[in-house]
């Protein structure tokens, strides 16, 4: 808290303001007297009370299992891109329903599993915690398919990333139509990491690209390069940033590699990669 008294042209003004994240020291500005009173910071955030009615239902869409044509790996969804947004939604008081492109059991990308021998995601205690819950494992084992979904039943849509979407989302007309239905109705419409591949071709009902005139993000070329070098091979069949920058009339942006970065442009919400899922969910 900073109290400032200004004396100028024989008129005295008193100003009390709150400064966040910085301290300003001013001296002898028109007779200014500065009193540093305190540097108090407060954080208050709603957390839904256990057992209270939900605020609505959010649809999360993941890739059905696939096999990478580049690496031969079994692929699907990235754990943190499901669990971190899921935690945000649940704590905010929303019910979540998980569906997939084809329905049925889902495949977790190996490197995203916190129990994987590689140790790549061993730090992901949020995913590890969900994996101990029977209801969560039941949800992964039995998803509805897209054709069973009525957008009117949900308040928002969130596309889960992973390696699978590079094969199952891009050019998926059924998913494009579903996502556009949410978007055109004004509902929050989100995609994170490789699930943003859908936006390379998705169109609105007037035939225009959904990202026309929009600022958005997705997995960066620099991040693809890092991943390729880490495993010693090319992992993805194409790169989202490279493809997005070929599109006229859209603004694709990325931040520092693997930093948490999300953008809301109207009701279109995008997150850069696996570390951006919670940030994107907060924007929903």
Model-derived segments and spans:
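Extended, subdomain-level signal for the structured scaffold at the beginning of enzyme domains
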Residues: 4-185, 198-284
């Amino acid at each position: 808290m900073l109290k400032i008294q200004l004396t100028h042209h024989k008129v005295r003004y008193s100003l009390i303001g709150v400064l966040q994240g910085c301290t300003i020291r001013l001296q002898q500005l028109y007779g200014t007297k500065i009193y540093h009173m305190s540097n108090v910071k407060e954080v208050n955030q709603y957390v839904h009370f256990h057992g209270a009615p939900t605020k609505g239902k959010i649809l999360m869409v993941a890739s059905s299992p696939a096999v990478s044509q580049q690496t031969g790996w079994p692929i699907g969804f990235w754990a943190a891109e499901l669990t971190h947004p899921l935690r945000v939604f649940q704590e905010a008081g929303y019910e979540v329903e998980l569906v997939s492109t084809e329905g049925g059991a889902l495949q977790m990308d190996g490197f995203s599993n916190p129990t994987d021998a590689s140790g790549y995601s061993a730090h992901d205690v949020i995913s590890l915690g969900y994996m101990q819950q029977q209801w969560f494992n039941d949800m992964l084992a039995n998803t509805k398919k897209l054709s069973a979904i009525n957008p009117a039943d949900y308040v928002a849509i969130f596309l889960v990333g992973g390696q699978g979407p590079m094969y199952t989302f891009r050019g998926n007309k059924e998913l494009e139509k579903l996502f556009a239905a949410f978007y055109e109705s004004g509902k929050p419409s989100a995609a994170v990491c490789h699930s943003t591949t859908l936006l390379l071709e998705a169109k609105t009902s007037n035939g225009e690209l959904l990202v026309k005139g929009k600022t958005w993000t997705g997995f960066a070329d620099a991040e693809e390069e890092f991943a390729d070098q880490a495993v010693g091979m090319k992992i993805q069949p194409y790169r989202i940033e490279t493809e997005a920058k070929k599109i006229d009339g859209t603004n694709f942006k990325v931040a520092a590699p693997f930093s948490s970065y999300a953008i809301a442009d109207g009701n279109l919400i995008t997150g850069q990669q696996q570390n951006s899922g919670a940030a994107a969910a907060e924007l929903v």
